[in-house]
Regions:
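Core catalytic region of metal-dependent phosphoesterases/phosphodiesterases
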Residues: 2-95
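Alpha-helix C-terminal capping segments
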Residues: 59-62, 80-81, 113-118, 160
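Active-site environment of divalent metal-dependent phosphoester hydrolases
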Residues: 10-14, 39-41, 72-79, 107-113, ...
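Binuclear metal-dependent phosphoesterase catalytic core
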Residues: 2, 92-96, 134-136, 140-180
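Thr-Gly-centered strand-to-loop micro-motif
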Residues: 6, 103, 142-143
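Internal catalytic-core helix/loop-beta-alpha segment
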Residues: 83-131
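Hydrophobic/aromatic beta-strand patches that form the interior of the parallel beta-sheet core
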Residues: 32, 67-69, 121-123, 139-141, ...
Length: 180
């Protein structure tokens, strides 16, 4: 299965539209959103074209393709408007023999690990910085941010397909790869 993985839309209609265009272009079967879907939070500037109602409409239109975990900016009020679940703290995916623990990153992260077995993968957003770090017992992956990238990183997403991870800018240009 081909997964598109993205994080931190933060209510930007512009970047949500760009992400969904990339999702269609990539022909991925599922889109995993790692939280912070609608609200920008008090620590971030407003993203371009901040319009949460438009983001709701766009994402509800592809609800059957979405898997989402809760970010620190996501609330029960957001869930009342969205037609797909967003309040799970984590999701578990399997890629071959490896388990992927997908979460937002504000609770569990490199500094505070969830219960992982040797060889598992910790996947989270939250920092807005794309990463791929091989630790002794686990692999840490971050797709970066769709709308508010940090540390001079591009507006980005991640593709997971057949054991290969490819980080891409929203225009589809690959800039980092890793094979599991």
């Amino acid at each position: 299965m081909k997964w598109m993985i993205a994080s931190d839309i933060h209510g930007s209609a512009y970047y949500c539209r760009e992400l969904l265009a990339a999702f269609e272009r990539e022909s991925a079967q599922k889109l995993l959103l790692l939280g912070d879907v609608l609200y920008h939070g008090p620590r971030n500037d407003l993203p371009r074209d901040y319009a949460p109602k438009q983001v709701i409409e766009m994402l509800n239109g592809i609800k059957e393709k979405l898997l989402c975990v809760r970010g620190n900016c996501d609330t029960e009020v957001d869930q009342m408007e969205l037609a797909f679940p967003i309040l799970a703290d984590y999701a578990i995916l399997c890629e071959g023999t490896r388990v992927i623990y997908a979460t937002h990153g504000h609770v569990y992260n490199e500094g505070k690990l969830p219960p992982l077995e040797k060889g598992d993968i910790l996947l989270h957003g939250h920092t807005h910085v794309p990463k791929c770090v091989e630790h002794e017992d686990y692999l840490y992956i971050n797709p970066g941010s769709v709308s508010i990238p940090k540390e001079n990183s591009p507006h980005s997403y991640l593709i997971l397909e057949e054991g290969k991870l490819t980080w891409k800018s929203l225009d589809g240009v690959p800039y980092m790869e890793y094979t599991l």
